[in-house]
Regions:
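Transmembrane and membrane-interface helices of multi-pass
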Residues: 1-230
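Soluble catalytic regions of membrane-associated enzymes that act on cell-envelope
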Residues: 190-375
Length: 375
C-alpha cells in the first residue's frame, strides 16, 4: 500500500518535471543532452526523497491495527484522505513554483515569503497576471484524477491471513524496509548524502533549475530568507567603491564593477601551467610572510620572494570555507548564517577559475568532491 502511494507521488513529480522542462527551456539556449539526462536523474532522486517522506506516515499507520490501511476500513478512508491532502499540497506547491519561475526565472525558494508581507498587493498581482480560476479548476481535476488512480491501484489489495506471522519474518520485513527507506532518503552511495548542491553540476544555468525539487529547495533556503542585498545602499556607495576598485567604466545604474585590462602577449608564447595549493589550518601570522623575524618558514618565504606574493589577499573571518570562497570569487565572505558556500541562493558566481578559458582544469580535493557549492 505504501509502495503504491510513494510511486504515485513520484510519478506526479516526474511528470511535472518533464512539463517544467518543456515549458521553460529556452529554445535559444537548449540544455545539452548529457546535462538533460543528468538533471532528470538527479531530479528523480530528489523526488524520491520527497515521496518517501510523504509516504512515511502511511507506513507508520501499519503499526496501528485499528487504523491499518489494509485491515481497517477506517484506516483505508484515513489514508485516502491523507493522500488527497498530500496531492493537493504537492500540486499547489508546483503550481506556485511554476508561477514563481515564470515571474523571476527562479525555482520556488524561501525568499518568496516576502510576498506575504503585503498580501493584498501580492494577491492582486497574481489575480491580474495568472489564470487563477482556470488554474484552480485544473488543480482540482488533477487531484481528483490522482485519487482515482490511487484508488484503482490500491482497491484490490486484500489482507493475507498469516502473512509474516512469525517474529523473525516481521523482524526481517521491518529491517529491510528501514534500510530501503533510509537509502532512498540518503540518495547516493557515498560518504555524504545527496544534497542541494549536487543539482548544480553544470555551468548551464537551466540544468540546475531542472534538477532541483521545489519542496526541498524551499526548505534548504529557509535559513537564508532574510539575507539579501540592499540595492539603494549599494548605489549610494557606488562612486566610492568604483574609485577604490579602479573601475574603468563606472555605471551607477547597472552597478558595474568590472575592470578591463589589455595584455600584450608575446607571439608564439604558450600558456603556462597554473598550480594552486591551498594550505588549510596554516598559521600565517607565525610565518615570515607576516613579518616574523625568527625565519620560521624559510622555504615559504623563498616561494613568496621569488614568485608572486599577493599580500593584499585577506579574508575577513576565520574558517576554511570562507577562505576558499574568497579565493575562488575574490569576494569577502560576510555571510551571517554559516558560510556563503552553503547558501543555495548565490550559487551563480563568476570565479577566477572561469577566466582560464584555454586551460584544462583538474581539481584534487582532500575531502568530499561535493563540498557545498564550491564544486
Amino acid at each position: 500500500y505504501t509502495i503504491k502511494a510513494v510511486l504515485l507521488f513520484l510519478l506526479v513529480q516526474t511528470i511535472l518535471r518533464i512539463v517544467f522542462w518543456l515549458r521553460f527551456e529556452s529554445p535559444f539556449d537548449p540544455i545539452p543532452g548529457g546535462d538533460l539526462w543528468q538533471a532528470m536523474y538527479l531530479g528523480l532522486k530528489y523526488d524520491l526523497q520527497v515521496s518517501l517522506g510523504l509516504g512515511i506516515p502511511i507506513l507508520l499507520l501499519g503499526w496501528i491495527i485499528p487504523i491499518h490501511p489494509v485491515y481497517s476500513e477506517t484506516g483505508k478512508r484515513l489514508c485516502f484522505a491523507y493522500t488527497g491532502v498530500v496531492m493537493l499540497g504537492l500540486l499547489s506547491v508546483y503550481a506556485i513554483d511554476f508561477g514563481h519561475y515564470a515571474y523571476l526565472e527562479q525555482r520556488l525558494n524561501a525568499t518568496a515569503l516576502r510576498f506575504l508581507e503585503n498580501l493584498q498587493i501580492s494577491a492582486t498581482m497574481v489575480w491580474q497576471t495568472y489564470p487563477v480560476i482556470t488554474g484552480s479548476v485544473i488543480l482540482v481535476l488533477l487531484v481528483y484524477t490522482s485519487l482515482l488512480l490511487f484508488r484503482f491501484v490500491t482497491g484490490y489489495i486484500q489482507p493475507i491471513p498469516g502473512q509474516y506471522s512469525r517474529w523473525y519474518q516481521k523482524t526481517a520485513v521491518v529491517i529491510i524496509t528501514f534500510f530501503v527507506v533510509l537509502f532512498g532518503l540518503y540518495g547516493k552511495l557515498s560518504w555524504y548524502p545527496l544534497r542541494w548542491s549536487d543539482a548544480f553540476f553544470s555551468t548551464h544555468a537551466f540544468s540546475g533549475q531542472l534538477a532541483t525539487n521545489p519542496i526541498l529547495y524551499f526548505f534548504n533556503t529557509l535559513k537564508n530568507k532574510d539575507e539579501t542585498f540592499d540595492i539603494p545602499t549599494a548605489r549610494a556607495s557606488y562612486p566610492l567603491m568604483a574609485e577604490f576598485l579602479g573601475v574603468d567604466r563606472p555605471d551607477p545604474e547597472k552597478l558595474d564593477y568590472v575592470r578591463r585590462f589589455q595584455y600584450n602577449a608575446d607571439p608564439g608564447r604558450t600558456e603556462p601551467n597554473v598550480i594552486v595549493i591551498i594550505l588549510e589550518s596554516f598559521a600565517s601570522y607565525k610565518s615570515g610572510l607576516s613579518g616574523n623575524p625568527l625565519n620560521s618558514t624559510p622555504h615559504l618565504d623563498r616561494l613568496a620572494s621569488e614568485g608572486h606574493f599577493y599580500k593584499n589577499f585577506y579574508v575577513t573571518q576565520t574558517g576554511t570555507a570562507r577562505s576558499i570562497w574568497t579565493f575562488m570569487t575574490g569576494i569577502p565572505d560576510i555571510e551571517l548564517n554559516k558560510t556563503s558556500s552553503r547558501n543555495p541562493l548565490i550559487v551563480d558566481q563568476h570565479t577566477i577559475v572561469n577566466a582560464f578559458e584555454s586551460h584544462e582544469k583538474f581539481y584534487f580535493l582532500g575531502g568530499s568532491a561535493s563540498w557545498a557549492n564550491i564544486r
